[in-house]
UniProtKB/Swiss-Prot annotation:
A biological process from GO: translation
Function statement: Forms part of the ribosomal stalk which helps the ribosome interact with GTP-bound translation factors.
Subunit-structure text: Part of the ribosomal stalk of the 50S ribosomal subunit. Interacts with L10 and the large rRNA to form the base of the stalk. L10 forms an elongated spine to which L12 dimers bind in a sequential fashion forming a multimeric L10(L12)X complex.
Lineage: Bacteria, Pseudomonadati, Bdellovibrionota, Bdellovibrionia, Bdellovibrionales
Gene Ontology cellular component terms for the protein in this record: cytosolic large ribosomal subunit
UniProt xrefs under SMART domains: RL11 (SM00649)
Listed InterPro entries: Ribosomal_uL11, Ribosomal_uL11_bac-typ, Ribosomal_uL11_C, Ribosomal_uL11_C_sf, Ribosomal_uL11_N, Ribosomal_uL11_N_sf
Highest taxon, organism lineage: Bacteria
Organism name: Bdellovibrio bacteriovorus (strain ATCC 15356 / DSM 50701 / NCIMB 9529 / HD100)
Keyword match rRNA-binding: yes
Keywords: Methylation, Ribonucleoprotein, Ribosomal protein, RNA-binding, rRNA-binding
Gene3D superfamilies, per database record: Ribosomal protein L11, C-terminal domain (1.10.10.250), Ribosomal protein L11/L12, N-terminal domain (3.30.1550.10)
Name assigned to this protein: Large ribosomal subunit protein uL11
Length: 140
């Protein structure tokens, strides 16, 4: 018989850098999860991903056990990494902070495709392009 789910927690944590400090500790502590066990498992699973921010969904069960699913980094994070930017524009319609070409958009869309709500790379590319525009990045 399946375990009874008592909670779902969504977090974004840098790869390989989970520790009991906020936001991880308080989020897991209120559900009674062994925080150090989660940190060890997460760090082991994401160690090879560099310093990317990894969204995760943690499922907590009634017996205080847990499972978690790692997702691909957010599109904005992938765009900033591709263009070597600190952040997007504060006024995206006026101030442009960089240019991204279609090859970079396609690479990001291919990376992010399993987590997006679309089936074709072309539709994923339009989502990535929309995110880039909202960050103040021109599409070349």
């Amino acid at each position: 018989m399946a375990k009874k789910v008592t909670g779902m927690i969504k977090l974004q944590i840098p790869a390989g850098k989970a520790n009991p400090a906020p936001p991880v500790g308080p989020a897991l502590g209120q559900h009674g999860v062994n925080i150090m066990e989660f940190c060890k498992q997460f760090n082991a699973r994401t160690q090879a991903l560099g310093d990317s921010i990894i969204p995760i969904i943690i499922t907590v069960y009634q017996d205080r056990s847990f499972t978690f699913i790692t997702k691909t980094p957010p599109v904005s994070s992938l765009i900033k990494k591709a263009l070597k930017l600190e952040s997007g524009s504060k006024q995206p319609q006026k101030d442009k902070v960089g240019k991204i070409n279609n090859d970079q958009i396609k690479q990001i869309a291919t990376t992010k495709l399993p987590d997006l709500n679309c089936l074709k790379v072309e539709s994923a590319m339009s989502q990535v392009a929309g995110t880039a525009k909202s960050m103040g990045i021109d599409i070349a």
